[in-house]
Regions:
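Short, contiguous, pocket-lining structural segments
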Residues: 16, 39-42, 60, 170
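Extended alpha-helical regions
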Residues: 1-7, 164-171
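A short, well-structured juxtamembrane/interface segment
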Residues: 32-49
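A short alpha-helix capping/helix-coil boundary motif
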Residues: 21-23, 45-50, 89-92, 109-110
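Glycine-rich phosphate-binding loops that contact phosphosugars or nucleotide phosphates
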Residues: 54-58, 64-169
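Short amphipathic alpha-helical segments, especially helix-boundary/capping motifs
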Residues: 3-5, 17-21, 43-46, 86-88, ...
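Generic N-terminal amphipathic, Lys/Arg-enriched alpha-helix
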Residues: 3-33
Length: 171
């Protein structure tokens, strides 16, 4: 087929591929090295203490958040994706984990506010800790990886587009 010839011209050579994946690995090493271990410990303590966990995110960060929710369920936690129709209401003892790379997504701010009114605790995982959303939470985990529309100068730059580094680092 004609499209096969087009595909052959766009194939990345092996050396270029190796250079790219080594660069991506170095980016992740830099993010891990820059993370505040006390924030990680605080986030883990919130997760361990929660009776039930609710997870929210939007766009590609939301896809990563759903994967994170599934992994928490595999660890034995009762976990709900906040957008599901069958999600129960939150109450004291519950935890809402909001993934918000840019730190300023209005509907996530609204949901954090509502969760706080129920007595649930709130954890925000973000690449922009000085923005509005992280300030709404009891605990904030700064992932210093480049995010889409991020402004924090401490984030690790990436050769990858948009917020790929942040989204990958969520795993």
């Amino acid at each position: 087929p004609a499209w096969l010839g087009e595909m052959d011209r766009s194939v990345i050579d092996v050396k270029e591929y190796e250079d790219l994946y080594h660069q991506i690995l170095r980016e992740h090493e830099s993010v891990f090295a820059a993370q505040d271990q006390t924030q990680i410990e605080a986030a883990l303590a919130e997760i361990a203490a929660a009776v039930r966990i609710f997870v929210i995110g939007a766009g590609r960060e939301g896809i990563a958040a759903r994967s994170f929710a599934m992994r928490l369920m595999h660890l034995g936690k009762e976990v709900h994706w906040l957008w599901d129709d069958t999600t129960p209401g939150m109450t004291t003892g519950d935890l809402l984990i909001a993934i918000n790379g840019s730190g300023c997504i209005g509907h996530i701010d609204y949901l954090l506010d509502q969760a706080g009114k129920t007595g649930a605790r709130r954890l925000v995982i973000t690449g922009a800790p000085a923005e509005r959303t992280p300030s709404e939470a009891e605990v904030s985990l700064f992932v210093p990886a480049m995010v889409y529309k991020g402004t924090d100068p401490r984030t690790i730059p990436s050769k990858q587009p948009m917020g790929n580094l942040f989204e990958q680092h969520l795993f």
